[in-house]
Amino acid sequence: RENNLSARVRSFIRGGVKDEEDALKGARDIIAEQVSEDERSRNQIRNQFSRQAIISSKVVKGKEEEAAKYKDYFDFSEPLKRCTSHRLLAIRRGESEGLLKVSISPNDEECTERLERSYVRGNNECSRQVQEAVRDAYKRLLKPSIETEFAALSKEKADEEAIRVFAGNLRQLLLAPPLGQKRVMGIDPGY
């Protein structure tokens, strides 16, 4: 089979394809694109993110003094599903100010193993090429895409929670008696 692969690859060497390695790289890129566009693959990775994603933040080198108000997040790591909304919003604020570097990531090895179980069959040169393509699909295409998706979703949930808390606090302020514990018989609106 491996000789067969080499012969098959040589048939694609023409035009912009210089050698066998170029042809194999092109084939791996095509496979990686197909894996990343497959809804089943995307759902597998989404499930991994929702179950075990970790949000991590680190201070940007050289900005330690400027980022002092974010010192709690200089070397921070926590499961995303347990990260409170105010903490997530603070981390994102530090990131948008260019003071923190933030990532959301599941266990990369477990994700690639799941994808490989879906796509890699056998143990030969062909399967090794497919395995390499699957790992590339995860690292270069799937992970960044799903990470962006989860960053947006988690920010949206945190924003909704912050609005809910703010609305509750505002309601309590508006419903509070205007003069505290003092009794009021009436208020003259013309005064």
Locate predicted features:
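Duplex nucleic acid-engaging cores and interfaces of nucleic-acid transaction enzymes
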Residues: 1-179, 183-185, 191
